[in-house]
Amino acid sequence: MKKHKTQTIARIALILGILVVLNIISIRLFGRLDLTSQKVYTLSDASKNMVGALDDRVTLKAYFTEDLPAPYNSNRRAVLDILNEYKAYAKGNLQYEFINPQGEKGEQDAQQQGIAPVQVQVVNEDKLEVKRGYLGLVMLYEDRKEVLPVIQNLSSLEYDISSALKRLTTRTKKKIGYTTGHGEADISAMRQTYQAVSSQYDLTPFDLSKGEPVPSDIAALLVISPQSRFQDSAKYQLDQYLMRGGRIAFLLNRVNANLQMRMGQPVDLGLEDMLQQYGTRVNPDLVRDVQCANISVLQQQGGFTFQSQVPFPYIPVASNFNANNPIVKDLQSIFFHFVSSVDTSGAAGKGLKTEVLVRSSKRSGRQTGFFLIDPFQRYTPADLAEDGIPLAAIVHGSFKSFFEGKQPPALVTSSPETRIVVVGDGDFMKDDFLGNRGNLTFLANIVDYLADDAGLITIRSKNVATPPLEQVSDGTKRLLKYADLIGPPILIVAYGLFRWRRRVAFKKAIEAQG
């Protein structure tokens, strides 16, 4: 008996010892099973290549207060895991250390580095207290420094670190131009969009109305939501910039829609003939889609006025993306605001190649001619019979000048291999119309694509987002509704009958044996 007890204690001690050793090993080694569809928690090839190409040592100082409550306590481990991965691929050129800012001197050091304290609520002995904590990262490279003051959003952690490393190790930023002079949207006034793009690029306004050439050091040019007609002098500068190998994004509103007036009017931008020369066009129509966002409207009933949410087909929530293009392949959804269809049927005849980036859903349609925009309008199946209307596209190849054989004569009549992006909505990136993170990522990915920075696209597009719900028919909705009402009682009754029959059978079996 005593021997058996000793053996049991020895086995328990051995198991505990093995568990302790495994725990120590798991802390020192980074190894995670990533079951997310987009491998959100796995370091991307772009990040691996970036740190693998470092030519000098980068030092990272992680200022993290220990013993913080949930959910902040998981942030430290997440940062530790990902820094271990970066270090493994950096070929000895990346080192990190964790610092717990304690006392006045420790906090002063963190704040001098640009790490601001955050207020964290802590429950201590049934009392709610506020504790100062630090959750920041400092990166040092040669005589340069980048700071991530607060790390809270773990889903974008890799992008935050990799983009900071890119800024830290890149000597000069590429210039991205955005046109002015025709009522275009001012990207510097779009707070979120400006922050997302300006962190990696030098954003430069350029007034096309002056008729001056687009500077050659502008890597890509954005034409965002112009309101007035382009004269030939402005079109000439766009054309010649493209002929010199420049890249352009045309983000255009072909219909000026006013929800308050419930009407819309076509907009003549004067760009249609030039875009057709480039194999594409934005049609003067509005795309409606069953897969759409809700809007708030005022309704009257019984003498009362109240606000309600109604689905509005002219704000499509697009999720039909080109799975082979890095701009959109990892996005979940984009909210468009009065979007027009894009036509690229003329590209093939000009020797150009196209890729449709975004399409409408399987149940969509278009409004043309006289535009009536009524949130309460009922649509027939025929109104929503189109499948996959193109909403954004790329045209690439060697373009022919729109001004060849015209006045003023083209200095350059054909371009080297280059590309343009065309989107039938010029508002999707504005602060008022950002439906979700997908809109911002879409615009930033377009800029990266035109500026030849595909690496950041793949990192940024990784996110833990919920895809839009699949649309179901009214008949399926009714079936699910009644199944939800009737199904549970039927299951309970069936289970009761099953138990009752088992008891009866068991009782009969006992009586038979007796």
What name fits each language-model region?
Residues 94-100, 131-136, 211-214, 256-261, ...:
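Low-complexity, flexible helical/coil segments
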